[in-house]
Amino acid sequence: MALSPLRKESEMTIDSHLSIAQRVQAKTRSTKRTYLMIKRMMDLVGAACGILLLSPLLLVITLLIKLENPKAPVFFYQTRVGINEKTFRMYKFRSMVPNAEDLLKDLLHKNEIEGAMFKMKHDPRITPVGRFIRRTSIDELPQLWNVVRGDMSLVGPRPPLPREVAEYSSYDKLRLRVKPGCTGLWQVSGRNELSFKEMVELDLEYIEKRNVFFDLQIIAKTARAMVGSDDAY
């Protein structure tokens, strides 16, 4: 199945929003149990194999982060919102200075993306090692543990922060009807080059179309994007 082009924002009307909302709601209600079982099996096998095969890389990154700042933690965790608005603790390699959250309030006016997200290409809170692991998406690898725990799936919408969800419309919240993922249609379609509205549309498109083969296609495209990617920050 080919990844379809993004729905243009100019084409999105109230009627089309209602139509998409109805289709997403119907899709999440009618999703076959067989698909969900296969998806969970893929998640467990994929995450376990990923942790095992990538363990040397995980060790190297751990050492680099520790050498950069011996007193700071290697891992960073944050409360995120998952399926049906249930919160969970999401893990990442720390890519910012330890007091990054305290510094955020002074940077909010420099947000480079519209909507309920914060993105800044030259964020001063990012460390030198952090810049590399963000560019290659290596900072996301600890989320494989979230997949094993069942908080996340390998493929699904990006898990938002509670403060982001507080700004969501009822339409935006449709993306919370499925389990969030380590990667998804948004991530392989432009990621930080896309607006918040475009991210929502891509997530809803994924929910409408999701199946085993579509998931595998997104995983394959993610693996290719991790090598030489320059749109992650």
Feature-to-residue mapping (PLM):
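Short, glycine-rich, amphipathic interfacial segments at transmembrane boundaries or analogous
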Residues: 13-18, 75-124, 183-201
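A short, structured surface patch at a secondary-structure boundary
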Residues: 116-178, 218-226
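N-terminal hydrophobic signal-anchor/signal peptide
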Residues: 1-52, 173, 206-208, 230-233
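A hydrophobic, helix-centered structural microdomain
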Residues: 30-100, 218-233
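An acidic site on a long C-lobe helix of protein kinase domains
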Residues: 37-41, 53, 125, 137-140, ...
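Cytosol-/stroma-facing membrane-proximal "stalk/adaptor" domains immediately downstream
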Residues: 165-189, 193-218, 230-231
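Residue-level signal for cytosolic alpha-helical hairpin/rod architecture
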Residues: 45, 126-129, 201
